[in-house]
């Protein structure tokens, strides 16, 4: 076979042979990552009805893809962590015995690529020449995955060359799980919802994914490698793999700092990563909007890289008002999945414009009528190259990463949590991360206003016992040679009694970043100590031009003692799921906050 002559790595070659014997594809193709290959595969998908080319006047070299209605999101119930013991996976993960799961998957994968091409996709998470980076090889029968991996990762010949004859790589096997009999016509989005499995084996750092063609389940470099496998590796190797954005922020005097920030989904991570400042002289630049790998540098500071090469952004709600940089980023060379299509070949989703254009074809390919179900799926996406972001930071591809001055944790909370507060210590900061939660919306979970705990925004992505993960974070404070960043909590989503947001949000969030910037510079008089952390001194916080009334300001920046006592109680109750594995330092911090609040 031609593919094998181009692979010098015997271990890789024998694995591909083994997979081919199991899955029985009709062809095998080694992907080189070239633009020519990308164009060829897009043309192939146009011919099968998988892709629709958009009007090049609006979106040059862009495509719309419609998935099956039952393959539209990550599937937590079919996502498994396989470790030698169940305790190692912890109470927040679905655990399966590795040997049992391998036998089960072996049966599922047997003959699953019949009638399809097996694509060999060498990819690198992180800059190729970086000590941070991890190389993987994904074997997949989905051309959609190949094209998406070209956008989302460094992929192709350069990665294969870097492996040489014996370099380490992670084995990532994926199939849509729909073999084709001779003469059987394919469907535009093959998948196998009844047999979906997204499985992570921590004993050999491998992933096997079956039955889904959707993003996080099928682009195995993203959540599977960059978070679930990487977080497990990071624990033993002394670093962190986090669900975080990374931004550079420059003040009017030209001083620059880097922040990372962790938010659960639907809390504005991409909007903050691409924020366009309204305050004169300030600049925000984006390194990444979703994943950060963080390692101690030689100088003792923590350095972060974005292991990804593209954005996989949620489309609904993205507009010229909320995120003009995101719209500019996905204007060309992008793939849109499950958005609506206009009559003149453009894309549309809820929130893009105030009024929907008519006529519209919805994400299922049917004529759309106003007042019915959404035209674009709520989890519809754009996949766009990182380098197209207008506010891309010059250090976006730095092999060493960028030094962090602040780590920010946030959630969607309508009450109690102030606009911004600073942890009193690293241990307190870890407690803020462990206690993160968001108020769900009816669209997400049926019950409006229910609190959903999501520690460090890593609940779906931590590849091992979360209590051990908390302990790993705490261990950084034990290393006296480290110069750790300050930790902050933020909440853009406080509401008044009428249910209206107290804070304007979006570009005005720069005012919060300005205060954080000043605190990392050591300005003491702009903050006041409280039981829950350092809160802004209202007189020293930049509210100029916002026209907020005094009551609103007080609600945004005050400590609601009663609310916080309930909050501490709620966090403590949640952490009971970890039993005696929950670190004592976190319990001690919660007790400290409780006793100080009662003394007030």
Curated annotation (Swiss-Prot):
GO biological-process terms attached to the record: cellular response to glucose stimulus; gluconeogenesis; glycerol biosynthetic process from pyruvate; oxaloacetate metabolic process; propionate catabolic process; response to lipid; response to starvation
Record-listed E.C. numbers: 4.1.1.32
Active site per database record: 267
Cofactor: Mn(2+)
Main location: cytoplasm
Annotated GO MF terms: GTP binding; manganese ion binding; phosphoenolpyruvate carboxykinase (GTP) activity
Family matches, as CDD domains: PEPCK_GTP
Residues noted as binding GTP in the record, renumbered to the chain: 266-271, 381, 412, 506-509
Residues where substrate binds: 74, 214-216, 265, 379-381
Subcellular compartments: Cytoplasm
Annotated keywords: Cytoplasm, Decarboxylase, Gluconeogenesis, GTP-binding, Lyase, Manganese, Metal-binding, Nucleotide-binding
Cofactor binding, per record: Binds 1 Mn(2+) ion per subunit.
Function: Catalyzes the conversion of oxaloacetate (OAA) to phosphoenolpyruvate (PEP), the rate-limiting step in the metabolic pathway that produces glucose from lactate and other precursors derived from the citric acid cycle.
UniProt similarity note: Belongs to the phosphoenolpyruvate carboxykinase [GTP] family.
Protein's name in the database: Phosphoenolpyruvate carboxykinase [GTP]
């Amino acid at each position: 076979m031609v593919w094998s002559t181009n692979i010098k790595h015997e271990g890789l070659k024998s694995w591909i042979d083994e997979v081919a014997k199991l899955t029985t594809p009709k062809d095998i193709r080694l992907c080189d990552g070239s633009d020519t290959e990308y164009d060829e595969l897009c043309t192939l998908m146009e011919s099968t009805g998988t892709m629709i080319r958009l009007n090049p006047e609006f979106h040059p070299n862009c495509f719309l893809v419609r998935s099956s209605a039952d393959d539209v999101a990550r599937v937590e119930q079919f996502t498994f962590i396989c470790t030698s013991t169940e305790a190692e996976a912890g109470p927040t993960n679905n655990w399966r015995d590795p040997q049992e799961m391998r036998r089960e998957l072996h049966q599922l994968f047997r003959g699953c690529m019949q009638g399809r091409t097996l694509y060999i996709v060498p990819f690198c998470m992180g800059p190729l020449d970086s000590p941070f980076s991890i190389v993987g090889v994904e074997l997949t029968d989905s051309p959609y995955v190949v094209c998406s991996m070209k956008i989302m990762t460094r992929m192709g010949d350069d990665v294969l060359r870097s492996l040489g004859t014996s370099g380490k790589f992670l084995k990532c096997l994926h199939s849509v799980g729909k073999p084709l009999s001779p003469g059987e016509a394919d469907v535009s989005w093959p998948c196998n919802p009844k047999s979906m499995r997204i499985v992570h084996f921590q004993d050999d750092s491998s992933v096997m994914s079956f039955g889904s063609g959707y993003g996080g389940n099928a682009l195995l470099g993203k959540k599977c490698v960059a978070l679930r496998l990487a977080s497990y590796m990071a624990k033993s190797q002394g670093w962190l793999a986090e669900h975080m954005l990374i931004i550079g922020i420059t003040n009017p005097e030209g001083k620059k700092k880097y922040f990372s920030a962790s938010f659960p989904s639907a809390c504005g991570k991409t909007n903050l990563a691409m924020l366009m400042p309204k305050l004169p002289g300030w600049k925000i630049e984006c390194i990444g909007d979703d994943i950060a790998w963080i390692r101690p540098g030689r100088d003792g500071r923590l350095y972060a890289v974005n292991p990804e090469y593209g954005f996989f952004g949620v489309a609904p709600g993205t507009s010229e008002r909320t995120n003009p940089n995101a719209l500019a980023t996905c204007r060309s060379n992008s793939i849109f999945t499950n958005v609506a299509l206009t009559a003149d070949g453009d894309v549309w989703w809820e929130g893009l414009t105030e009024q929907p254009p008519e006529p519209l074809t919805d994400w299922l390919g049917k004529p759309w009528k106003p007042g019915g179900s959404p035209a674009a799926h709520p989890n519809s996406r754009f996949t766009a190259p990182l380098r197209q972001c207008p506010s891309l930071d010059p250090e976006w591809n730095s092999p060493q990463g960028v030094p962090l001055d602040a780590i920010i944790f946030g959630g969607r909370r309508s009450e109690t949590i102030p606009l911004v507060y600073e942890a009193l210590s690293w241990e307190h900061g870890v407690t803020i991360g462990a206690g993160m939660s968001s108020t769900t919306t009816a669209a997400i979970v049926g019950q409006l206003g229910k609190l959903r705990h999501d520690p460090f925004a890593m609940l779906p992505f931590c590849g091992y016992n979360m209590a051990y993960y908390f302990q790993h974070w705490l261990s950084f404070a034990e290393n006296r040679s480290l110069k750790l960043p300050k930790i902050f909590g933020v909440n853009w989503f406080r509401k008044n009694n009428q249910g209206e947001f107290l804070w304007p949000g979006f570009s005005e969030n720069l005012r919060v970043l300005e205060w954080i910037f000043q605190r990392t510079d050591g300005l003491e008089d702009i903050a006041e100590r409280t039981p829950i952390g350092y809160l802004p001194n209202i007189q020293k916080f930049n509210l100029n031009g916002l026209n907020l009334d005094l009551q609103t300001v007080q609600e945004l920046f005050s400590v609601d003692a009663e609310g916080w006592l309930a909050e501490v109680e709620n966090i403590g109750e949640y952490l009971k799921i970890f039993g005696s594995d929950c670190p004592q330092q976190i319990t001690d911090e919660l007790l400290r906050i409780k006793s100080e609040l009662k003394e007030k």
